[in-house]
Each structure stands twice: as structure tokens, then as C-alpha cells.
């Protein structure tokens, strides 16, 4: 069992039950999935760029990413419907907790000029989204082997009903929010 999963069951659940007055353990918000998404617009010109992005994503997420395709044609961006434009990975259960552990303890402290995560990035339904400008903050990425610095979106989906519950859940996992 992942370290953060144990932490959730032993410390976070009782803490949130006391704080929000839940009657059942099943009411306590929990993490459902973490989605990593990398949009690679330059892949239109060169297929190798997308292949490198897929390899980076596989190293970071620990599983093979799905290549995403354009939903409709946009002449201004020179893309046609069905063209590959990015990749994404959905992490659940043990891999999700392992990734979250690496994100909080290793990757986020390596972000340059980091002043804390934006506490307003919740969507109103208990999910949190953040952007990462460089994939090199993850220790799995070898700086010498990357072709370009790419960013990615990280979305944390939880069963929380409100933003306050979701924020309390992530704070219990020691998320470094800006004050």
C-alpha cells in the first residue's frame, strides 16, 4: 500500500470526519483519479515530437499514455479532425497515490520561483487543476535526453462536494497552497 494511502486512511479520514461532522466514513472525500494531460500542438509538423512527449509522459505517469486527437478541424492552427495533438494518462488507486507522493515531496519543490499553489484553482465541484510549465521538475525525466521543455496539466479529481472539502483534503496531504 502506498505511503499516502496509509496516511489517508489513518490520519486524514478521522481529521476530516471531526472537522466536517461526517457520520459515516464513506462520506469523507477521497481521491478518485489524477489526470495528466500534455497538449503538443507542434506535433502537426513533426510526428517525432509527439513520440517524445509520449515517452516523457510514460516516464512521469508510470503507464502508457493515450494519444489524444483533434475533435474538429481548425485552419488557423493547421489541424484537421482526427490528427494527434497530445497525450494523457489517467492514474487511479496505487499509481495515483505514488504519483501524488512524488509530486508533493519531489516535483513541486523543484519548480523555479515557486511561491505556493493557487488556492483558487478549484472548479466548484471539488476538483483541483494545476499547470506545470516544465516536465523536467520530475526526477524521472533526464534533462540531457529531452528535445524540448513542455508543460502539462494535472487534474486531481475527488469525491468532495464543495471546494472547501477538497481543499481540506489536499491540505491534509500537505499540498503547499499559497496563503
Curated annotation (Swiss-Prot):
GO cellular component, one term: ribonucleoprotein complex
Protein name: Large ribosomal subunit protein uL5
SUPFAM superfamilies named in the record: RL5-like (SSF55282)
PANTHER family associated with the record: 60S RIBOSOMAL PROTEIN L11-RELATED
Record InterPro entries: Ribosomal_uL5 (IPR002132), Ribosomal_uL5_bac-type (IPR020930), Ribosomal_uL5_C (IPR031309), Ribosomal_uL5_dom_sf (IPR022803), Ribosomal_uL5_N (IPR031310)
Subunit organization: Part of the 50S ribosomal subunit; part of the 5S rRNA/L5/L18/L25 subcomplex. Contacts the 5S rRNA and the P site tRNA. Forms a bridge to the 30S subunit in the 70S ribosome.
Similarity-based family: Belongs to the universal ribosomal protein uL5 family.
Single annotated GO MF: tRNA binding
Function according to Swiss-Prot or TrEMBL: This is one of the proteins that bind and probably mediate the attachment of the 5S RNA into the large ribosomal subunit, where it forms part of the central protuberance. In the 70S ribosome it contacts protein S13 of the 30S subunit (bridge B1b), connecting the 2 subunits; this bridge is implicated in subunit movement. Contacts the P site tRNA; the 5S rRNA and some of its associated proteins might help stabilize positioning of ribosome-bound tRNAs.
Gene Ontology biological process terms, A to Z: translation
HAMAP family listed in its UniProt record: Ribosomal_uL5_B
